[in-house]
Amino acid sequence: MATATQIFLSPDHAGIARVSECPVGAIEAANHLLQTNHDEHHMFWRPVAGHNHLTHSVLTILALGGGPAELQRAFDDARDIQRPIPPVDRQVVEQLGDPEQFRSRIGQLDQYSNFLAFFSQEIATKGYRAVVDEHCFSGSRNAETLFAQLYEGLYHPVIHLAFGIEFEQPSIVAEALAQVASHDSMGIEAFLMDCEAEATQSAHSGRTLVQLFRDAEADEALRHAAEGFDDGPARVRDGVLGRTARAITALAAQFRVDPQDIEHRLAEMINCSAFITGAVQRTGKPRKIDFFHLHTVTASLSIDILVRQPWISPVVKARLVEWKARVDLVWYTATGAVQLHLPSLLNYMPTSSAGMDWAALYRAVAAVHDDGHLAKLVRALKSGEAVSNPFEKGAGETFPIQGIAWLKLAQMAYDTTVDRPIEQKWIWGIGFDENWTHVLSLESEK
């Protein structure tokens, strides 16, 4: 039985968007690897943008149908960079039961192990659903902060939480909540709260999410907001939210979700995540995928998983979808708000993946060296296809990714990353010239 400190996977909860059964020994191998990670490794392997992806990698390969060898490969590919989990300060853990003491430590990465011990105790007593609801969705001052913290760090806290909930592993939920509480801030909470205030004060424009992305693309100040910064967090914190806070808030606040329309708006958000990931390219260069955009797709699966939970209220579900789309607009702007050109995806001709269907692509992805980003993206696209499909017919540009485009984007992700070193797999800010220097022009490749 899975507990707040012990991993115990079940074939009944082996991941959504599957195309095959679990191979012999896969569940047992995954249990061992995940327990090792839980017991030995820190959630952060460096102070900034250094998230431990081992849990994501192992569980995604399990969902893709990988066996013991593929699971071990996924674990080994990212094990060397991990660092040991720090010792727990029991006095601090006791103090975390006081809301003010808890609040004073939010956003401090060095408090991860203390938060992990605290949430493990809470879950052991109350169950993970009650603890998530209390600490993220109850509306208390601290819960509002942690709700927003789910979207910090390029969505990694909500991604980790969704893995714990999807696979029904209380110990992974405890890891996620500890990450949520200890993650440093890029200013996402203030942005989201400002959006909510703006939404209550202004009329609903009725603009679709695609239209809002195109509005960002057309806004010169937003397009240039992130210029001059070297990394994603700085582009968000100091660029988009620092230089153009009023403009991005006014834009993002226009995306609103009624609790009666969650499924439609969820599908719209998922579809648009795929749209910005595949349709943003650079003229004269081979197709590539932006590292930050791909996380909008991966996190869209995470929001879908949370929306599926009957114990989460419709009001919270609406907010989860609403906030995700608003943060997507921030990240699109932080990569330069590059022109969205759907033919760049629709006209793509697969190379290494030519002729593959989803099952074949799953097998190929499970076998290649990867730190988890490719595998998570491909599974999220397969799931997104199913969620979006009922709403695509007659939707026009509101749902730009339709039919074969879902598989084609997954093939593009595989083709452009397979057998490449990590620094050459993705574009780390697709709108900035310096990030394309390692990519030969199309003329140079002829």
Swiss-Prot record:
<dbReference type="InterPro" id="IPR025337">
    <property type="entry name" value="Questin_oxidase-like"/>
</dbReference>
<keyword id="KW-0560">Oxidoreductase</keyword>
<dbReference type="GO" id="GO:0050246">
    <property type="term" value="F:questin monooxygenase (NADPH) activity"/>
</dbReference>
<dbReference type="Pfam" id="PF14027">
    <property type="entry name" value="Questin_oxidase"/>
</dbReference>
<protein>
    <recommendedName>
        <fullName>Questin oxidase</fullName>
        <ecNumber>1.14.13.43</ecNumber>
    </recommendedName>
</protein>
<comment type="similarity">
    <text>Belongs to the questin oxidase family.</text>
</comment>
<comment type="function">
    <text>Questin oxidase; part of the gene cluster that mediates the biosynthesis of geodin, an intermediate in the biosynthesis of other natural products. The pathway begins with the synthesis of atrochrysone thioester by the polyketide synthase (PKS) gedC. The atrochrysone carboxyl ACP thioesterase gedB then breaks the thioester bond and releases the atrochrysone carboxylic acid from gedC. The atrochrysone carboxylic acid is then converted to atrochrysone which is further transformed into emodinanthrone.</text>
</comment>
<comment type="pathway">
    <text>Secondary metabolite biosynthesis.</text>
</comment>
